[in-house]
Amino acid sequence: MEIRIEGLRKSYGGKPVLTGLSAVFREGITCIAAPSGTGKTTLLRLLLGLERPDGGRILGADCRWAAVFQEDRLLEDLSAAGNLRFALGSLPGGAGALLAQLGLDLSDPKPVRAWSGGMKRRLALARALLAPSDALALDEPFTGLDGENRARCLELIWRAGAAKPVLLATHDLTGLEDAPVLRLGDR
């Protein structure tokens, strides 16, 4: 699978965010690295079809995406299992094992509002990894995670990248040294 962007442009209020960006994304992790406010989230939103570019072309992005946004977008009154059922329609096989790898318990009946930010972040990642998809868009997926939980998440993200494009927007490239990096410009 290949996703290609050619001459991509996007501005907000007359201020350019992306100016003529071109890249090709294939299976594996590609890190999108840049200071805050320089287009990482914008690029992901364009690829996901949540926004339209001002110019340029996006080819191959009309596939099934799974995403982790900067906000976890969980239903706070539901348990982990309830959140997964709501988002995915049912509990996929392997959900319990995947959550266990992330240090979470699928059978925990507590609503996620009682969980820490890091636990919610890991559940959001699990939801994306369990969703049927051709590509993953991960926007700052390590926010709120300690070193041990970041390592757990990284292992699963690397595995996912063996079969599909994974676009990972981050400020911190620790553990991602072997991934290609698309650096967006400073403002």
Where are these regions (language model features)?
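Walker B catalytic motif
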Residues: 111, 140-141
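Q-loop/switch helix immediately C-terminal to the Walker
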Residues: 71, 78-90, 94
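Conserved ABC nucleotide-binding domain
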Residues: 98-116
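Hydrophobic anchor residue at the start of the ABC signature
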Residues: 125
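Conserved structural motif at the start of ABC-family nucleotide-binding domains
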Residues: 3, 17-20
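ABC-family nucleotide-binding domains
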Residues: 139, 146
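Helix-to-loop junction immediately C-terminal to a conserved catalytic motif
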Residues: 48
